[in-house]
Amino acid sequence: MKIILRKDVATLGDAGEVVTVKNGYANNYLIPQGFAIRATEGTLKALETEKKQQAHKIEQRRKEARELSAKIEQMTLNISTKAGESGKLFGTVTSGDIADALKAQGVEIDRRKIQLEAPIKALGKYEAVAKIYMDIAAKLNIVVGAEGAEAVETAEAPEAGE
């Protein structure tokens, strides 16, 4: 009997595949358990249209992911945090902090998709990778600065002009 798998079955194949199995196996186990449906002309046509729709959705998501990747790679994330005089941070800059900085600039990415090469524990420039969709990733440029540094620089600027 020809059947269409609805779920992955280790011994038969992946979901969406058309396979031939013995009648008893299909009627007594696969179909009642929801692992498969009978392969009729109607179900085969429905499977083809579903595959086309899935391919279209995947292509649409890939296009959106490429656009988002290009947008992210043009950004520079400025993260301010508490740091000591030697430039060492009190704590670390995590992927959650980077995700929050991206969200502040209008881009929402899950923190688990941001990969750091090493923990950020000092002031400076860093790079990270954000996995956006499947094989599409974006390089993040991150500048970590001290929280009080901007206030000190702006306070010194008027004095120099006088």
Curated annotation (Swiss-Prot):
InterPro entries: Ribosomal_bL9 (IPR000244), Ribosomal_bL9/RNase_H1_N (IPR009027), Ribosomal_bL9_bac/chp (IPR020594), Ribosomal_bL9_C (IPR020069), Ribosomal_bL9_C_sf (IPR036791), Ribosomal_bL9_N (IPR020070), Ribosomal_bL9_N_sf (IPR036935). One of its GO terms (molecular function) is structural constituent of ribosome. PROSITE patterns: RIBOSOMAL_L9. One of its GO terms (cellular component) is ribonucleoprotein complex. Keywords: Ribonucleoprotein, Ribosomal protein, RNA-binding, rRNA-binding. GO terms for biological process: translation. It comes from the Bacteria. HAMAP family: Ribosomal_bL9 (MF_00503). Binds to the 23S rRNA. Belongs to the bacterial ribosomal protein bL9 family. This is Large ribosomal subunit protein bL9. The gene is rplI.
